[in-house]
Amino acid sequence: MKTLLLTLVVVTIVCLDLGYTLTCLICPEKDCQKVHTCRNEEKICVKRFYDKNQLGWRAQRGCAVSCPKAKPNETVQCCSTDDCNR
């Protein structure tokens, strides 16, 4: 009986997705509070700053598989802990 119970527990653990899922902020505002659960393959939070037509800097936040390269007139910050892209 104990063996059967142990087997069921092991099978349950293997079948469940017990992997860690990262959360990142996804809104463009300065005081961003909107949290998004990233897909399993997205392990990076990104915050991009870019110059919006000489009207000042804007931020774009989200999840990514890898840290993107910065484009001209853009700064990219990457991190890998929950909600680290504030």
UniProtKB/Swiss-Prot annotation:
According to the record, the signal peptide region is 1-23
> Could you tell me the keywords of this UniProt record?
Acetylcholine receptor inhibiting toxin, Disulfide bond, Ion channel impairing toxin, Neurotoxin, Postsynaptic neurotoxin, Secreted, Signal, Toxin
Q: In which tissues is it expressed?
A: Expressed by the venom gland.
For this chain, the annotated S-S bridges are C24-C45, C27-C32, C38-C63, C67-C78, C79-C84
Q: Where in the cell is it found?
A: Secreted
- Pfam families with a match to the protein in the record: Toxin_cobra-type
Q: Name one GO cellular component term.
A: extracellular region
Instruction: List residues traversing the bilayer.
Output: none
Annotated PROSITE patterns? SNAKE_TOXIN (PS00272)
- Please tell me where this protein is predominantly located: secreted
> Under the GO molecular function aspect, what terms does this record hold?
acetylcholine receptor inhibitor activity; ion channel regulator activity; toxin activity
The role this protein plays is: Binds with low affinity to muscular (alpha-1-beta-1-delta-epsilon/CHRNA1-CHRNB1-CHRND-CHRNE) and very low affinity to neuronal (alpha-7/CHRNA7) nicotinic acetylcholine receptor (nAChR).
Give the UniProt family note: Belongs to the three-finger toxin family. Ancestral subfamily. Orphan group II sub-subfamily.
Q: What is this protein called?
A: Weak toxin 3
Name its species: Bungarus candidus (Malayan krait)
